[in-house]
């Protein structure tokens, strides 16, 4: 049955479950604007999702659209998409936790030019190792539509060059929503 505390009359889309299973990121479209919300598991029930990440230039949620958020493995960063990025196309951003008790997140930052292109980026998945990001993009050296790429973070916190995962992962069509097991031996698309 529907989880009434999460389902509303608006468009509600789950993005990412925290690695401890206690928090869920959702994006909602209200008044033609998409924003990231978070719900917490209280015992066995999900609390009402709240936009606790702000609504200003110094927050995750801005006057642009923010969607498809997911946690990093340490649950101290979230990665999400915004249409306020380079050339007003969808770009990957991240934000770090500033105050966990009050659920205050820092200003969104671009994942950088090695990841974001002048074309649209899509879904993002952080591998459990915390150093590997899989994402979809229409840019870089896409085979057609969105392809799945991988990038690795260096010791300074910068993402390295995007690498196309190639065939059989990518096709001439849109390839999105990659995830894998912790071992990396099994992937889901």
Residue ranges and their predicted role:
Residues 1-189:
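Short, conserved micro-motifs composed of acidic
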